[in-house]
Curated annotation (Swiss-Prot):
In the C-terminal section; belongs to the NAD synthetase family. It comes from Xanthomonas campestris pv. campestris (strain 8004). CDD domains: GAT_Gln-NAD-synth, NAD_synthase. ATP binds at G298, L299, S300, G301, G302, I303, D304, S305, T405. Disruption phenotype: The deletion mutant is able to grow in the minimal medium MMX, similar to the wild-type strain. The XC_0719-XC_1067/nadE double deletion mutant is only able to grow in MMX supplemented with NAD(+), but not in MMX alone. One of its GO terms (molecular function) is ATP binding. This is Glutamine-dependent NAD(+) synthetase. Pfam families: CN_hydrolase (PF00795), NAD_synthase (PF02540). One of its GO terms (biological process) is NAD biosynthetic process. It comes from the Bacteria. Deamido-NAD(+) binds at N381, E410, K522.
Length: 552
């Protein structure tokens, strides 16, 4: 954390970039009250700003349908208001008003609720479905209050992506606008956000303090990266992404400009660095918030499980991670050696349980029915399911969460065994294509000294090792081709003809698209994993399992 010298200022704003877990109303309220005291007493702030729906956490989803939950949030706001002696606080909460609920932010001062703003633009796309829960107040007022002679307005998150809410707030007299957010991370979002802030400040002339929540919530990871922008369009360097921290700024009213006072620099803002930190934060918070102190994973000596192991160690510490080597008759000696090498390097306990007894037992049990058949993918899947049973048994007996190691490419085309390698409670690589997995592994090996993933893991051909001399490319196109097609089809919703026009072979495109369609049922049963792309599998890509449409 860096601090600049305290200088004369018109307004000091303390922006609370912290994690406010969904549903933890009492915990969030206690922390908000503590943060109010810190902002007033430690930073001598005039205003303390909290994220969107800080009291309830975001997104509360169907908790908002429970009257008791809404009443609890309202009671919490009253408690918080009572703590606002000598400081102004802006706090997000779900406001119940008869039969409707608003996504609201209230201005609290000297023990009372001075004003409340109700969000006008409710996102209803991708991961958002706010119109399921919230209403827009057609008669809602602008929220502008005076703090030390400065006219301060409030709008909420999505409101900033439309010109009208900010314009109306400025027309009502605001020169400084506070924007509480709960905006989840995806690749490229920081540049998009900074461009938006520059545009909005230039067109309105208002200065903007943009606060985003931080932390993992199921498949969503909120990155923080809060930022301020001067009235002339200058966007200051952001606070660190995925870090709980204060961002304290001094606002000069006459100049409509900010001077950062307390902040944490973001450091490496490369795409790989941000994606890594998103996954690690998502994994850490999923475990912590759901009561898992340790994790298990099957370590094969391949790239996917090696990357998940490194992520788990970064998230939880090596002492809380147990890797399990599950060799079969088809496992190469190199695979065993690489698993052992990585665990030694990371200080992770490695257990070895051969799957041959379980596999042979299943073959014997099924033998009478399989007598007149030839071995095929069924026998391959029995190996994967044997591994899944063993990992889940360890979790049941000793506690801890099993991590699955599949990637987005595999989930897309069904190159994963349901109840086998898909067993587990969290999928760190779920929104990373195989080519991105390789890229992240190479990037992580450049950070912090010795490689955390053996280089031979990265360089060897990917293989499920379920039969002799098997490689992934026996069943799939090369990953650079496969991922190029998948990105266009899944992330960008391009048609078959569009993808072929981009240079991909028509028969390959048709094969890949058919696999995607056929494996919707598998994806519906997959564990959650952190969203890092514009279009992740899960709540933002809602295709029916039973689907008669085969058009492109």
């Amino acid at each position: 954390m860096m601090e600049s010298a305290v200088t004369a200022h018109t307004l000091r704003i303390a922006m609370a970039q912290f994690d406010f877990p969904v549903g933890a109303v009492t915990q969030n309220t206690d922390r908000i009250i503590e943060y109010i005291a810190a902002a007033r007493d430690e930073f001598e702030a005039d205003i303390v700003l909290f994220p969107e729906l800080a009291i309830s956490g975001y997104p509360p989803e169907d908790l908002l349908l429970r009257p008791g939950f809404l009443a609890h949030c309202e009671q919490a706001l009253a408690r918080i208001a009572a703590a606002t002696r000598g400081i102004v606080a802006v706090v997000g909460w779900p406001q119940s008003a008869g039969s409707v609920v608003y996504n609201a932010a209230s201005v609290l001062r000297e023990g009372r609720i001075e004003a409340t703003y109700r969000k006008r633009e409710l996102p209803n796309y991708a991961v958002f479905d706010e119109r399921r829960y919230f209403d827009v107040d057609p008669d809602g007022d602008n929220c502008v209050v005076t703090v030390k002679g400065v006219q301060v307005g409030v709008v909420i998150c999505e409101d900033l992506w439309f010109a009208e809410p900010l314009a109306k707030t400025v027309q009502a007299g605001a020169e400084l606008v506070l924007v509480p957010n709960a905006s989840p991370y995806e690749r490229g979002k920081h540049a998009q956000r900074d461009a938006l802030l520059a545009e909005r400040t230039r067109e309105s002339g208002a200065a903007i303090a943009y606060l985003n929540v931080v932390g993992g919530q199921d498949a969503l990871v909120f990155d923080g990266a809060s930022v301020v922008a001067d009235g002339d369009g200058t966007v200051h360097p952001a606070a660190a992404a995925f870090v709980d921290q204060w961002l304290v700024v001094d606002y000069a009213a006459g100049e409509r400009s900010f001077t950062p006072v307390v902040w944490v620099d973001d450091g490496d803002e490369s795409m790989d660095a941000l994606a890594w930190r998103a996954v690690v934060r998502g994994l850490k918070d999923y475990c912590g918030k759901n009561g898992f102190r340790k994790v298990w994973l099957g370590l094969s000596g391949g790239i996917d499980s090696a990357l998940v192991l490194a992520m788990a160690v970064d998230a939880l510490g090596g002492e809380n991670v147990t890797a399990v080597r599950l060799p079969s008759r088809y496992t190469a000696g190199l695979s065993n050696d690489l698993a052992d090498e990585q665990c030694r390097a990371l200080g992770v306990k490695l257990e070895t349980i051969a799957i041959e007894p379980a596999f042979e037992g299943l073959l014997a049990a099924l033998g009478p029915l399989f007598a007149d058949t030839q071995p095929d993918i069924t026998e391959e899947n029995l190996q994967s399911r044997s591994r899944g049973v063993i990992l889940m048994a360890l979790s049941n007996k000793f506690g801890g969460l099993v991590l699955t190691t599949g990637n987005k490419s595999e989930y897309a085309v069904g190159y994963a065994t349901i109840y086998g390698d898909m067993c587990g409670g969290y999928a760190p690589l779920k929104d990373l294509y195989k080519t991105e997995v390789f890229g992240l592994a190479k990037w992580r090996n450049t950070v912090g000294g010795a490689p955390v993933i053996p280089p031979a893991v990265i360089s060897r051909p990917p293989s499920a090792e379920l039969r002799d001399n098997q490689t992934d490319q026996d069943s799939l196109p090369p990953y650079d081709v496969l991922d190029g097609i998948l990105y266009r089809y899944v992330d960008q919703e391009q048609s078959r003809d569009d993808i072929v026009a981009a240079g991909y072979a028509a028969d390959t495109v048709e094969h890949v698209l058919r696999l995607v369609r056929l494996n919707e049922w598998k994806r519906h049963q997959a564990a959650p994993g952190p969203k890092v792309s514009r279009r992740a599998f899960g709540r933002e890509r809602r295709y029916p399992i039973t689907n008669g449409y085969s058009g492109q």
